[in-house]
Amino acid sequence: MERTIRVTGKGNISVKPDTIRLRISLEDIFREYDDALRHSADSVELLKDMFGGLGYDRKALKTLYFNINTEYESYQDRDKSWKRRFKGYKYTHRMKLEFPADNKQLGKILYALAHCPVSPEFSIEYTVADPEAAKNELLGEAIKDSMAKANVLATAANVKLGNIVNIDYSWGEVDFVSKPLEELSLRCCEDACEPASYNMDIEPDDIDMADTVTVVWNIA
């Protein structure tokens, strides 16, 4: 019977974020479906015009999710029974814009969003421009850790490592994201700011990531 040893290695890396991901959400409700659809399209055009005025390609604003659903509300009838009535059509449009991490540019974008007539909700994330390279580095560290542990175990057990029989990795999504601005009041940025810009002074921490790989070796 073939003898094997199975060892799980853990990789850890710290990556400096170099990209800002701006998540933008628009939603509103209208009595007519056509009005909801038209208002959504018009609002997105306003945002694209705004970003275009800041020097970005209009196509840089990417749609993540779009939907229009019927909305109902509960009410109490004269006989005290609860009923539902049609409220309207609610659209939800979620988008993102990614750009190189730059506090000055971020300040201009936040100022424009705060003074935008469509008043979108938004959040800010820091990430990396090349996540695949970071993932590969993370996997490499996990493999190295597995090999180091396997050699220690083999030496302690007085056996010799043979060929690798199997490498097991979940291939789950690894999202390199830092959120230093969980709560942001744009009013706090008003003081001493340039015209049409907020004074942002943000230095995001490195993104710490970990992942595991399980390797099976023959032993003799």
Question: What is the predicted role of each segment?
Answer:
Residues M1-A220:
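Short, charge-dense linear interaction motifs
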